Amino acid sequence: TKILERKWMSLTKKLSLSLFSIFFLFFITQLHSQEKFISGKAKIVDGDSIRIEKHRIRLLGIDAPEMKQLCKDKNNEDYACGHLSKNFLISFIDDVKNLKNLKEVFCYYSEFDKYNRVLGECFVGPKRIYNLNQAMVLSGHAVAYLRYSDKYLKDQEEAMIKKKGIWSGEFIFPEEWRKKNK
């Protein structure tokens, strides 16, 4: 019986340690994955960045053409796709706000990028149903930024098929353009 007791005690200790480890990992994971939010009147910086009060927010999972970037339209004519991207984001937010009589943009975040910008998913509309990140990709004014997330890849495929925005002509992916134009 003493041998059985020792085995039982050993098993109980191992089980307790395992349960404690699982609980500890779960707690740490929950602590780090808790999203925070910022809300307020947004100032549009470019097609994938906004500012709410003192917070610089980079729209997570998307990459829009840079402000100085040119793309080619379906007629092979150059156009300022970076400016067009920014203007689309401004118009989209304004249209939803005016339609629904709303004043705020809500951004959920849990991390920062190397420039100390909030990486966020931003929404407007009643019950925050209009996802700005998704709208930019679906409209063809931004691409899915796979370095951070593949969440908008299906939206990008839809924009490509429908030849929306930058997909109607030729362009260099924003990340490539930045590398070439440092």
Predicted regions and their residues:
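Small beta-barrel nucleic-acid-binding modules, primarily SNase/OB-fold domains
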Residues: L4-R6, S10, L17-S21, F27-K182
